[in-house]
Swiss-Prot record:
Inhibits post-transcriptional processing of cellular pre-mRNA, by binding and inhibiting two cellular proteins that are required for the 3'-end processing of cellular pre-mRNAs: the 30 kDa cleavage and polyadenylation specificity factor/CPSF4 and the poly(A)-binding protein 2/PABPN1. In turn, unprocessed 3' end pre-mRNAs accumulate in the host nucleus and are no longer exported to the cytoplasm. Cellular protein synthesis is thereby shut off very early after virus infection. This is Non-structural protein 1. A motif (Nuclear localization signal) lies at residues 30-34. It is found in: Host nucleus; Host cytoplasm. Pfam families: Flu_NS1. It comes from Influenza A virus (strain A/Goose/Guangxi/345/2005 H5N1 genotype G). Residues 171-206 are annotated as: CPSF4-binding. The lineage of its organism: Viruses, Riboviria, Orthornavirae, Negarnaviricota, Polyploviricotina. One of its GO terms (cellular component) is host cell cytoplasm. Homodimer. Interacts with host TRIM25 (via coiled coil); this interaction specifically inhibits TRIM25 multimerization and TRIM25-mediated RIGI CARD ubiquitination. Interacts with human EIF2AK2/PKR, CPSF4, IVNS1ABP and PABPN1. Keywords: Eukaryotic host gene expression shutoff by virus, Host cytoplasm, Host gene expression shutoff by virus, Host mRNA suppression by virus, Host nucleus, Host-virus interaction, Inhibition of host innate immune response by virus, Inhibition of host interferon signaling pathway by virus, Inhibition of host PKR by virus, Inhibition of host pre-mRNA processing by virus, Inhibition of host RIG-I by virus, Inhibition of host RLR pathway by virus, Interferon antiviral system evasion, RNA-binding, Ubl conjugation, Viral immunoevasion. The dsRNA-binding region is required for suppression of RNA silencing.
Amino acid sequence: TVSSFQVDCFLWHVRKRFADQELGDAPFLDRLRRDQKSLRGRGNTLGLDIETATRAGKQIVERILEEESDEALKMPASRYLTDMTLEEMSRDWFMLMPKQKVAGSLSIKMDQAIMDKNITLKANFNVIFDRLETLILLRAFTEEGAIVGEISPLPSLPGHTDEDVKNAIGVLIGGLEWNDNTVRVSEALQRFAWRSSDKNGRPPLPSNQKRKMARTIES
């Protein structure tokens, strides 16, 4: 905690020097002011002097930079992971008992006529820093290959976080399990998006959470 505060103080100082040269835009300056207030509060909580912490942070950053190669300074590129084939992504499907919910910038659809099925969630998405960056499409498949649910970004509301996707997955799972379906999550989704499945890939949702999620779909 102390070393994190020290590094944050030094990086704030670097950004302040940048702003002093009138190079920062309005959002940059706004973040600078907000971060200054935050650092003062953290300094009071930790009982640390900001100026002293800034010097210590400078030493930490300099030590890191001495050990870094130019290759290590490059921003990592995102990876595209695919659970579904192009045919599975582009296939049309219909619902006997359609239910639809908009959660933030994500659309959730499911067929609530589906009962007592084994269902697997598959998705195609981008990953960066070992976390889901952008969901392209998620679909729920029965063992027979039928599509019974879907999560997709809304074109009119771009931008979503991995937490948004996780919440949407929870809503979809809750709605499907309400009808006594067994839902499993693909290995890629377990690793990068859901992160709460058991060893068999089945997300353990308590019954009260299932009911809450099902009501969310119905509303």
